[in-house]
């Protein structure tokens, strides 16, 4: 490369054999560069790289010698190609950042935050945390005439206007009302129009469809009287069984066995009715037989008379 750069100029004849001394065809006029080209080929390429053009050596009929001669002649034997548009340094555009600065992408704006201010004085802070009150005991059955409180204990007062700040427990005034509890049908002493202390009786409430008051369970009947009557007057074998079942009913009631008492009561009733039915049937049959015998006796007497 250094030998090519330091070769003889075109005015000195070449001593080497052809084709070095062959005449060269006329070269195309080069595009004038924006600045004066440097003397060396290395600086020539460096300049055109900076100015946006590239210089390519033109190959003629002389092969490598033509290329060397063209390199010595410089711009007269080279073709200049324009630099692509994307390699050209862009000029400063309107609103563009200065060179050497990086542009960050625009982020979406922050969501809108609404800050509400409450006018007026804030409610006082709640009192110090205290242990919660124990749960109220479950209501139990009480004797007639006792009262049952509807609220257990005092729980505070409600502030004026009925406004309760959020986050504060609701406080109510202690209730002093008591509801008297009386069984249905029991007399109680109350303030009636007749005067204080007058005893009155609550009427039973009206019963709707499907509503019934629970009444105490009645003990089963022993059917002892009808068992004795049927034993004496009607049919004594079944009557004795009915009396025995009636005694079992009383024994079961004495020990509190209602189921056995009900079973024995039904059996005593059935045997008593059997004794009654057998006794009635026997009376009817005896009456019929008596009538038949009387009629037959009269007919026999008439037959034997002269």
Curated annotation (Swiss-Prot):
Gene Ontology MF: a single term:
signaling receptor regulator activity
Q: Disruption effect?
A: Decreased Gria1/GluA1 and Gria2/GluA2 density at extrasynaptic sites and increased density of Gria1 at synapses. Reduced cell surface expression of Gria1 and Gria2. Reduced phosphorylation of Gria1 'Ser-863' and increased phosphorylation of Gria1 'Ser-849'. Reduced synaptic transmission in immature hippocampal neurons. No change in basal synaptic transmission in mature hippocampal neurons. Shown to impair tetanus-induced long-term potentiation (LTP) in 8-12 week old mice in one study. Another study shows no effect on LTP in young mature mice at postnatal days 24-36.
Renumbered to this chain, the Basic residues biased-composition regions fall at 40-49
Stretches assigned to the Cytoplasmic side: 1-223
Tissue-specificity statement: Expressed in the brain (at protein level). In brain, expressed throughout the hippocampus with weak expression in the olfactory bulb and neocortex (at protein level).
| Record-level GO BP terms | learning or memory; long-term synaptic depression; long-term synaptic potentiation; protein localization; protein localization to cell surface; protein phosphorylation; regulation of AMPA receptor activity; synapse organization
- Bilayer-crossing residues are 224-244
Chain ranges inside the bilayer that never cross it: 276-296
Family in the record: Belongs to the CD225/Dispanin family.
Please state what the protein is called: Proline-rich transmembrane protein 1
Origin species: Mus musculus (Mouse)
């Amino acid at each position: 490369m250094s030998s090519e750069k330091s070769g003889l100029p075109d005015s000195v004849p070449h001593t080497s054999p052809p084709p070095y001394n062959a005449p060269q065809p006329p070269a195309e006029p080069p595009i004038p560069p924006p600045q004066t080209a440097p003397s060396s080929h290395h600086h020539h390429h460096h300049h055109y790289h900076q100015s946006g053009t590239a210089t390519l050596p033109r190959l003629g009929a002389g092969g490598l010698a033509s290329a060397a001669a063209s390199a010595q002649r410089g711009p007269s034997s080279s073709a200049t190609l324009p630099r692509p548009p994307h390699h050209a340094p862009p000029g400063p555009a309107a609103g563009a950042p200065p060179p050497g600065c990086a542009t960050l992408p625009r982020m979406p704006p922050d969501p809108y935050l609404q800050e509400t201010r409450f006018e007026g004085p804030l409610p006082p802070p709640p009192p110090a945390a205290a242990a919660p009150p124990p749960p109220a005991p479950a209501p139990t059955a009480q004797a007639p005439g006792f009262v049952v409180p509807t609220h257990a204990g005092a729980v505070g007062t409600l502030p004026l206007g009925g406004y309760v700040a959020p986050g504060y427990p609701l406080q109510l005034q202690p209730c002093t009302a008591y509801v008297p509890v009386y069984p249905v049908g029991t007399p109680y002493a109350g303030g009636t129009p007749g005067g204080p202390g007058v005893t009155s009786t609550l009427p039973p409430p009206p019963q709707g469809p499907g509503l019934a008051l629970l009444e105490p369970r009645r003990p089963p009947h022993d059917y002892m009287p009808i068992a004795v009557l049927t034993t004496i007057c009607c049919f004594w074998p079944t009557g004795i069984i009915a009396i025995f079942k009636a005694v079992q009913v009383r024994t079961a009631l004495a020990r509190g066995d209602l189921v056995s008492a009900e079973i024995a009561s039904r059996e005593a009733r059935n045997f008593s009715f059997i004794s009654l039915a057998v006794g009635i049937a026997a009376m009817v049959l005896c009456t019929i037989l008596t009538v038949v015998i009387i009629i037959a006796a009269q007919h026999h007497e008439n037959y034997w008379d002269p």
